[in-house]
Amino acid sequence: MAAGPISERNQDATVYVGGLDEKVSEPLLWELFLQAGPVVNTHMPKDRVTGQHQGYGFVEFLSEEDADYAIKIMNMIKLYGKPIRVNKASAHNKNLDVGANIFIGNLDPEIDEKLLYDTFSAFGVILQTPKIMRDPDTGNSKGYAFINFASFDASDAAIEAMNGQYLCNRPITVSYAFKKDSKGERHGSAAERLLAAQNPLSQADRPHQLFADAPPPPSAPNPVVSSLGSGLPPPGMPPPGSFPPPVPPPGALPPGIPPAMPPPPMPPGAGGHGPPAAGTPGAGHPGHGHSHPHPFPPGGMPHPGMSQMQLAHHGPHGLGHPHAGPPGSGGQPPPRPPPGMPHPGPPPMGMPPRGPPFGSPMGHPGPMPPHGMRGPPPLMPPHGYTGPPRPPPYGYQRGPLPPPRPTPRPPVPPRGPLRGPLPQ
């Protein structure tokens, strides 16, 4: 248990233990700190007259990492009802002491060293356990304490943040403490700050910043940047948060799509009998009497590879020749539908008008607007609704109604002979 000379100790692996009760012995101190790591030796200075220890001791560990771990887990724990102070040896603390000592006044009597350590350790490294001045007879707090920080940055932050704050329902006062060797001069002078800046040990143990690595507050999302480099949405697209544009009328182009340019005029005799009419197949391919196959298959649906500009050029009706000229004017007559398909002409007299051809959308004879620019979907009839009653076929004449069939009556039973008067 007995320690060797101080010069033979590993000061970096030795911790100072203060605030020990008189019942604490070296074997108990050995077993207590053995939980933090392997202990080399323990030493508790004793009074030569009484033979009792003076309330503090030293514990040497096998490595410096074990000593640092013991300081973290053993500091301010209670032993026999008293919180013990565990930190590095005093020789090491003297090298780190730069004079950043603060005074804390108007403390509540219930505040102990543990509460002060937990409160002020958020601002930086504390070299020694906070010292609360107590009455030697009763042990009650006198209402003020001292804290020694490892840097002036930590002490400045503690004074700025905690001065005037409430701690246990009392506003505390935090300022630099007075120096012991001079009257009326406080710590934190320019000379002390200059010496602290030149101390390499104090620069190695910089105080930690609790909220220095906090993420920045979330900012507003940036608008969509188009290919033009501005914050406006692309042409034809509604701005964020607005309603979709209305559905364009049949035959009209959706907003934002430029109209198709008319084809250049053809010289006479370049592929037909006279200049072709607008919209004919020969208008876009001079020198050919017959153009390429129709861009739309029978049924009115365009090819998947066609763009919106080609749809606008070929017309809104889904046919390859929307504006064919009359016979004899140089244009070609409209093509006849394949067998089995209804003729696009007017219906016979008395018949209801035909609906749109198979494959074309209801109510939209023109090209469909591009995806993302359509309006709300059309209202659909409720489930089970069959529509109004159909009219009778054309030429049907209802004849006179047949007479109602007589309902047979049940036979009446024959009546018997009349009875005479009842006997008296």
UniProtKB/Swiss-Prot annotation:
It comes from the Eukaryota. Pfam families: RRM_1 (PF00076). The modification Phosphotyrosine is found at Y56. It is found in: Nucleus. GO terms for molecular function: RNA binding; splicing factor binding. Residues 207-424 are annotated as: Disordered. Residues 232-268, 332-381, 388-424 have a biased composition (Pro residues). The modification N-acetylalanine is found at A2. Keywords: Acetylation, mRNA processing, mRNA splicing, Nucleus, Phosphoprotein, Repeat, RNA-binding, Spliceosome. InterPro entries: Nucleotide-bd_a/b_plait_sf, RBD_domain_sf, RRM_dom, SF3B4_RRM1, SF3B4_RRM2, SF3B4_spliceosome_assoc. SMART domains: RRM. GO terms for biological process: mRNA splicing, via spliceosome. Component of the 17S U2 SnRNP complex of the spliceosome, a large ribonucleoprotein complex that removes introns from transcribed pre-mRNAs. The 17S U2 SnRNP complex (1) directly participates in early spliceosome assembly and (2) mediates recognition of the intron branch site during pre-mRNA splicing by promoting the selection of the pre-mRNA branch-site adenosine, the nucleophile for the first step of splicing. PANTHER family: SPLICING FACTOR 3B SUBUNIT 4. Belongs to the SF3B4 family. This is Splicing factor 3B subunit 4. It comes from Rattus norvegicus (Rat).
